[in-house]
Swiss-Prot record:
Basic and acidic residues compositional bias, start-end: 17-34
Gene name of this polypeptide: PPP1R7
Subunit and interaction comment: Interacts with PPP1CA, PPP1CB and PPP1CC/PPP1G isoform 1.
Annotated ranges, domain LRRCT: 331-360
Identification of the protein by name: Protein phosphatase 1 regulatory subunit 7
Phosphoserine: modified positions: S12, S24, S27, S44, S47, S322
Tissue: Widely expressed.
GO molecular-function term, one example from the UniProt record: protein phosphatase regulator activity
GO cellular component: chromosome; cytoplasm; extracellular exosome; nucleus
Amino acid sequence: MAAERGAGQQQSQEMMEVDRRVESEESGDEEGKKHSSGIVADLSEQSLKDGEERGEEDPEEEHELPVDMETINLDRDAEDVDLNHYRIGKIEGFEVLKKVKTLCLRQNLIKCIENLEELQSLRELDLYDNQIKKIENLEALTELEILDISFNLLRNIEGVDKLTRLKKLFLVNNKISKIENLSNLHQLQMLELGSNRIRAIENIDTLTNLESLFLGKNKITKLQNLDALTNLTVLSMQSNRLTKIEGLQNLVNLRELYLSHNGIEVIEGLENNNKLTMLDIASNRIKKIENISHLTELQEFWMNDNLLESWSDLDELKGARSLETVYLERNPLQKDPQYRRKVMLALPSVRQIDATFVRF
């Protein structure tokens, strides 16, 4: 399973890779808990609590004393075990959980993944917000479908090659610099790598079942190596170092594209993405709405914080009969005293302009 756009889309965006986290659910919002679909976020998102890069150690956590595991009573017959924020410092004593399918250990003091080999029925493992530096000792968990090790201290993607049934992988807000060691995850549908240190999109050619890819808040300079991901419906690349929209020609099923907070100057390269319902190009350097008249299924268009000056550019959106939400604030044309009225006249289907609903 697993980003806010209220007054100001920036807030929304950060929720997405996360919100998307919602979709991805898992990406942001405190990240909420991913397991949804939507709205990754940064979400996402989600809203992602996609936030600051975390230091090697949190001084407060270092002084927090781990709980004595003998004081925790585990139900041997439980299928869902939630030990969120229990101050667990070491994974031990869980071998009695022969029937467990979901194990939540988020927000604890765990430094090492260990002693889980007996939990062979496990489908979901949540280690979000701990102090883990390495992905290891998961080889026996061959039934695992969801793995979340977001908000830890990981530097490498490793130790997941035997998890061939994995469908959702969340590694948000770590210190990962390279996408690697994922080639065996043929069933993966959602991959969340927001808020890391990744510089290139690479080594994902075999992930042909991937539906959602979240790479917001990294250091990526080019959209590339996406040709094999023909099932992708959500792509989030917010807050990177992109200057050009390219490499999307094979993503014919793409429905949501998030490219805000980059250095893009021209809307282009979307000729084959006819199914887009959401296009986020906010906070770039774009002067003109162009090359999107064929996107007739658009429902949301976010282009606030750019350099748009001409009202005639809105004609590019007239073919999108289902367009309901547009964000155009903090563009030069917003200075027009008749700004909202002109948007409504140009795009009569719109029900929300920026953060405000249209009143009739």
